[in-house]
């Protein structure tokens, strides 16, 4: 019927290396990411505790975790998912854990010919722009990590009428995923209820932009404030009255 979810799946090699997130990876893959981080001069932090990163909600969701998350929210296996991302790390092995739950996973390379994509292939920013446009126009947008593009897409969708954007509570989800892994929880109605309750107020409904934390001064004040391009309400969104004026 043309409806689809746009999934901003931040599971590229450089993202995992930069954040130090190695959960679910093999030892060889983890070593490869560590070496990449150590050899990238402009990345200042070299030693990262992957477990602490994940527990703190600072890691992108894995393809498997995204699949579990979407099923818990009640999306059927027939759901079309457009993956807005660069090359997924360990594509076949890791993506299979998402595709096994949602077979209708598509990429821009599957929707356009090589000739059509050729005009953009040498410019990463232009291929990212394609993902951006498709994400803005999707029925539902879900980012697996809160990077700059995800924030910009969310803000754009708010500006266009607060289109549905589901913002995963990564810190909360990790606790639930770990309970699944340890056998304390099982996938099913009870698990779904926990996930849905956790995300009841994280679906792009209108809300005022969050200001800086109280007591914070100087430049740090701006770092604690929700960015304008992530949520332009109320400064840049008109509010209409019953009479039609704004």
Where are the regions that the model predicts?
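N-terminal targeting/anchoring "stem" of glycan-biosynthesis enzymes
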Residues: 1-246
